[in-house]
A protein has these predicted regions:
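Short alpha-helical
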Residues: 33, 147, 192
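Short, contiguous acidic/charged loop-to-helix segments that flank catalytic cores in large enzymes
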Residues: 53-59, 89-93, 124-129, 158, ...
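Short, solvent-exposed turn/loop segments enriched in Gly/Ser/Thr/Pro and often Arg
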Residues: 27-31, 160, 190
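Amphipathic alpha-helical scaffolding segments comprising HEAT/armadillo-like alpha-solenoid repeats
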Residues: 116-124, 145-157, 175-187
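Beta-propeller domains with acidic blade repeats across secreted/periplasmic ectodomains
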Residues: 1-122, 143
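Structural detector for internal amphipathic alpha-helices that build alpha-solenoid repeat scaffolds
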Residues: 131-144, 162-176, 180-187, 192
Length: 192
C-alpha cells in the first residue's frame, strides 16, 4: 500500500452493494484514508486484481480501522483515531478523549431500514453475508451432526461456491461420512 497502513479486512458476501464488490475482498487502509475492494478475475493458473475505492476521505482524522458486512448486506466501517497514529502517544484512553465514528455503506436510493423479523434458520445463517451469523449457523449445524446431512447436502449441491464449501466442511466432520464427502469434493467440477 505504499505509505499506507493496512488494518481491517473482510470478504464481501452480500448482494446489496453493486456487483463489482460482491464476493470480493474489502480492506481498510488508514494511511491514505481509504476503504478499498480488490475485485479479482481468473488469469491463467492464478488471478488478476484491480483496486476500487469504496469510501475515501480527505479528512485528516479519518482513519478506517475495520470493515464488516451486516446481515442485510450493508457494510460497516469503523473509523478510530488516536492522537498519534500507531499508538506512540495514545491520547484516547480516557472517556471524553476517545474519538471514532462508524459508517454504514448502502447504495443510494435503497431502503436502509433493517429488520430482524425474517425467520432465520441455521442453514440460512450459514449463507448470511455477516460472519457472526454464519458462525452461529455453523455451530448449530455442527452440533446436530448427522441429523443435518440431508439439509447440508442440498446446500452442497447448490451453485454458490462459498456456502457449498461451508456445507462440505460440516458434512466432512460427520463421523463415518468423512471419506464420502471429501471424495466427492475431490471429484467436483469446480477447480477452486
Amino acid at each position: 500500500t505504499g505509505q499506507g497502513s493496512p488494518t481491517g479486512i473482510a470478504i464481501y458476501e452480500g448482494d446489496l452493494l453493486p456487483k463489482v464488490f460482491q464476493g470480493q475482498m474489502m480492506h481498510c487502509d488508514a494511511g491514505p484514508r481509504v476503504v478499498r475492494a480488490y475485485p479479482v478475475t481468473k488469469s491463467g493458473a492464478g488471478y488478476k486484481g484491480e483496486i476500487v475505492n469504496m469510501l475515501q476521505s480527505k479528512d485528516p482524522w479519518y482513519r478506517p480501522s475495520d470493515v464488516c458486512t451486516a446481515p442485510d448486506g450493508s457494510v460497516f466501517v469503523a473509523d478510530w483515531h488516536d492522537g498519534h497514529v500507531g499508538g506512540h502517544h495514545m491520547t484516547d484512553h480516557k472517556p471524553g478523549q476517545m474519538t471514532g465514528r462508524i459508517y454504514r455503506l448502502t447504495p443510494k436510493g435503497k431502503n436502509t431500514q433493517y429488520t430482524i423479523s425474517k425467520k432465520r434458520t441455521a442453514l440460512s445463517m450459514l449463507s448470511s453475508p455477516n460472519m457472526a451469523a454464519r458462525y452461529i449457523g455453523w455451530q448449530q449445524l455442527n452440533k446436530v451432526g448427522a441429523k443435518a446431512e440431508s439439509t447440508l447436502g442440498k446446500l452442497w449441491k447448490g451453485d454458490d461456491q462459498r456456502p457449498r464449501a461451508r456445507a462440505l466442511h460440516l458434512l466432512a466432520r460427520i463421523k463415518g461420512l468423512e471419506k464420502k464427502y471429501i471424495g466427492a469434493a475431490l471429484k467436483d467440477a469446480n477447480p477452486d
